[in-house]
Amino acid sequence: MNFFVTHSKTILALLMVFVASTVSATECVPSHWGADDQIGAANRVNPDRTVAAAKLIKKGISHPLGIEIDPSMPAYPPRYTQLQVVQPTQQFGADMGVGWNGSYNDDILQMWLGTGPQLDGLGHMGEAGQFYNCNEGKDFSFITGLTKLGISDIPPIVGRGVLIDIAKQMGVDSLSAGQPITSDDIKAAMKAQKVTVGEGDIVLLHTGYTDANLKNNPALWAGSIPGITNEASVFLASLKPTAVGADTWGLGAVPPREGDKVFYDHVVLLKENGIYILETMNTGRLAAESVHEFMFVLGQARLKGAVQMIINPVAMW
C-alpha cells in the first residue's frame, strides 16, 4: 500500500528508539501465580467474578467490541490481510460428485494476526529478549510457533467490563494523533464518570480516534495514535485488571510523549504484570450510551503457538 511507503521511515525511526531503549539487561519479574504460570492475569477470572458480571445484564443488550476487518484497512507494516473466496472442484455448476447438484463457497485467509481488533498474548512483547514470568524468547519462540505463553493456553476471559471515556473527559469527540493520556487523566475521567475498577476487570479506554479517522483519514489513523503514557500503564497495572484495551491499534501514544519509550506500555502490562492488551476495540456505542460497566465475554480462537489473535469480544448490559 502507498501508506506503508509513506510512513515506513517514521515507523523505522520509532522502532530504532524502542530497540535502543531495550538493549540493556532487564530485571526478571516473576509471576504472582508461580514459576510455571503461563496465563498471567487470566488467573483472575473466577466463578464469583463471572457470576457478578452476569448480574450487570439488565436490558439484554449485546454489542460487538471487534470492528469489521476489511482487507483494505491499513495495518502496522508489514502486516496485511488477504481474503480469497473459491469454489473448489465445482465453480457453480460442475458436478461435485456427491450425488446431488451441490454448490458451495470456501475461503482462504492470509493475514497477520496482529491486524484489526486483536488480543495481545503474553508472548507478544518483552524486553531484551525476556518475556513474561522470566521466560527467555530464545527458549520458546520458534518459526513454527510459541511453545509457551501462546494464545491457545488462555482460558475464556469473562468478567466485568469497564469503559473509561477519555474523549468525554477531554471535551472532544476524538483525541488528536499522539495525544498522551496520563494517569491523572484516567483518574479524573473515572471520578467524573463514577467509574471504579476492581481486580479482574477488563478496562477499555475510549478515545474516539478510530470512529473519527479510520474511514475518513486512514493514513492519519495508521500513522499515529493517542494513547496512554508509560506511567499511566503502571497506574492501570496497579488496579489489577485482567486486560486493558482501547479503540486504537496500539494502546500507548504513537509517537510517545517526550521522555517516554514507544510501545513500553506493552512491556509494563504484558511482561511485568501478565495483563492482556486489547486493541482496536469498538467502543463508540458504549461511549454514546454512557455504558460504563457491562459483562465482557471473550473466547478467542485457540490456534496453537499463536502470539496474537483477531477477536470479537461481546459486551452485554
Cite the ranges covered by each PLM segment.
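Bacterial N-terminal signal peptides that target proteins for export
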Residues: M1-L12
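Short non-domain terminal segments
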Residues: M1-N2, M16, Q90
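Bacterial N-terminal signal peptides
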Residues: I11-S21
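Active-/binding-site microenvironments in catalytic and ligand-binding cores
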Residues: T26-W317
